[in-house]
Amino acid sequence: MAVKIRLAKKGRKKLALYDIVVADQRAPRDGRFIEKLGNYNPNTNPSTVVLHEDKVIQWLFNGAQPTNTVKNILSSQGILLKRHLQIGVKKGAITQEEADKRFLVWKESKTQKPGKFKA
């Protein structure tokens, strides 16, 4: 059973909202899913993303593959960086404190940069 982290469409026509879910890749897009990990609202400026980070990282470690869109969302939220740093901690390449420090430096640099769109 191949498990994917993907978007499930909610909302109405021309005002779509998406749930970020873990589902079997053979299941319908809006149908059966294993677990809901968060939601994504592309209608706001900037887009709103709410995630349960611990659950997402756990599913990534268990082998779930994100789709391209979800991979971009996770990357912008820093989830993939956090997972990458945790792999380094497990292998003994860096300590947990150093991983936390690197993540905080990344998060601070991201908040200081101006966004793509100005309101």
UniProtKB/Swiss-Prot annotation:
Gene: rpsP
Keywords tagged on the record: Ribonucleoprotein, Ribosomal protein
GO cellular component terms attached to this protein's record: cytoplasm; small ribosomal subunit
Pfam hit, one: Ribosomal_S16
Biological processes, Gene Ontology terms: translation
Family (UniProt): Belongs to the bacterial ribosomal protein bS16 family.
Cross-referenced Gene3D superfamilies: 3.30.1320.10
Protein name listed in UniProt: Small ribosomal subunit protein bS16
GO molecular function: structural constituent of ribosome
Source species: Amoebophilus asiaticus (strain 5a2)
UniProt xrefs under HAMAP family: Ribosomal_bS16 (MF_00385)
